[in-house]
Design a protein with these regions (language model features):
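Chalcogenol-based redox active-site neighborhoods
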Residues: 1-158
């Protein structure tokens, strides 16, 4: 998928500062000590698989919230595109714009020759360590959507 290093379970999660669809900037560090963070990298807004994936995550949102976890979708799309995308598919959790590709690179999921990230999920605990991760090798396959049930199981064990 990439030539960058993907942070492993147990390692510190890279911080980020990304603009949400509402124009607000979000950082990982502002949640440390308070909430777990689930980062769901998706290739592109309005693409067929992403349009299927994110509503599934929206349906699971109450379970993540009950586990004291904030959820963010992350793509290289502009925050305006993410706002329109969120409205069109009924997603209420923040979709963050990685316009400069810095977060995608830091998490090792940027596909340089395509200019967007692969499909990947990282669960970061309250101490800022990666508790669980799943990387999809095929960004265009619905079967390769990361198993978020596994993320919930990792939270239950933590």
């Amino acid at each position: 998928m990439q030539t960058m290093t993907i942070p492993d379970v147990g390692q510190a999660a890279p911080d980020f500062r990304l603009r949400g669809a509402d124009g607000t900037f979000y950082t990982l560090s502002e949640y440390l000590g308070d909430q777990n963070v689930l980062l769901v990298f998706y290739p592109l807004a309005f693409s067929p698989v992403c349009t299927h994936q994110l509503p599934e995550l929206q349906a699971m949102l109450p379970r993540f919230e009950a586990a004291d976890t904030v959820v963010f979708g992350v793509s290289v799309d502009s925050h305006w595109s993410n706002a329109a995308f969120a409205r069109s598919i009924g997603v209420r959790f923040p979709l963050l714009s990685d316009w400069k590709r810095e977060a995608s690179a830091a998490y090792g999921v940027l596909i340089p020759d395509k200019g967007y990230s692969g499909r990947a999920s990282f669960l970061v605990d309250k101490q800022g360590r990666i508790l669980w991760r799943e990387i999809s090798e095929n960004t265009g396959s619905i079967e390769e959507i990361p198993s978020l049930e596994a993320a919930l199981a990792a939270l239950a064990k933590a």
